[in-house]
Amino acid sequence: MAASLWMGDLEPYMDENFISRAFATMGETVMSVKIIRNRLTGIPAGYCFVEFADLATAEKCLHKINGKPLPGATPAKRFKLNYATYGKQPDNSPEYSLFVGDLTPDVDDGMLYEFFVKVYPSCRGGKVVLDQTGVSKGYGFVKFTDELEQKRALTECQGAIGLGSKPVRLSVAIPKASRVKPVEYSQMYSYSYNQYYQQYQNYYAQWGYDQNTGSYSYSYPQYGYTQSTMQTYEEVGDDALEDPMPQLDVTEANKEFMEQSEELYDALMDCHWQPLDTVSSEIPAMM
């Protein structure tokens, strides 16, 4: 049975042939591509639906190439893919996620997903967080639909090797307090990892968090609506992602503390009168 993926963030010049070639370049074969256009103006709405032979192929493609550079795109863009629901109600089954830290730059979404799904079948996706230039920030998230498997993964994979070149560091990703929003359309699918935060602070905080690619929520109506109506992005900054176990260089911290203390001491001493040369020296007049 054929299955489709939603593909967004398209430029006007990206037609069916361009999309098909882009997938072919990544080693994926698509059955068809449907570019959605505004019903009144005929202008492309900025998204399309890509059909695959079956659901397994579509899922494999989603995990393999989502977030990777889009071949031939000018300016440079990345694949922005999601499941297409075609009128089905959103999947409201509970999700249990893990924060995955200490990821090396070579780890992508597909590798993260495959590392967990081969042992924990309820794993539903993996997301490596990227900066604005597309470089990994060194951490990501994985989702599970089975809480027991999430807990097993947390225990069994803590410090595991085989995902990149460093042992992985895991902690529970805690969902933020949910914000109630009206559902305007029945055709909606949420695929956001920005709803999670960590219970400790300053995970790579020096880089800042302005993540705009590969992590989003959207809703799309029936064909013919404009892109602004079709797609609503969650404005949730990545500054909410925090470090479960920050590294502290004790030696460096002590050095900085001593330097600051010496500066304070010198400043205090400079506020006093200068010492007299001898006991018989004349005391300077007050200014």
UniProtKB/Swiss-Prot annotation:
Which SMART domains does this UniProt record tie to the protein? Answer: RRM (SM00360)
Q: Which residue spans traverse the membrane?
A: none
Keyword Protein biosynthesis included in the entry's annotation: yes
Alphabetically ordered keywords of this record: Cytoplasm, Nucleus, Protein biosynthesis, Repeat, RNA-binding
Where is this protein found? Answer: Nucleus; Cytoplasm
Name all RRM domain ranges: 3-86, 96-175
Question: Taxonomically, which superkingdom?
Answer: Eukaryota
Q: What does this protein do?
A: Involved in the early steps of selenocysteine biosynthesis and tRNA(Sec) charging to the later steps resulting in the cotranslational incorporation of selenocysteine into selenoproteins. Stabilizes the SECISBP2, EEFSEC and tRNA(Sec) complex. May be involved in the methylation of tRNA(Sec). Enhances efficiency of selenoproteins synthesis.
Name of protein:
tRNA selenocysteine 1-associated protein 1
Recorded source organism is: Bos taurus (Bovine)
Q: What gene is behind this protein?
A: TRNAU1AP
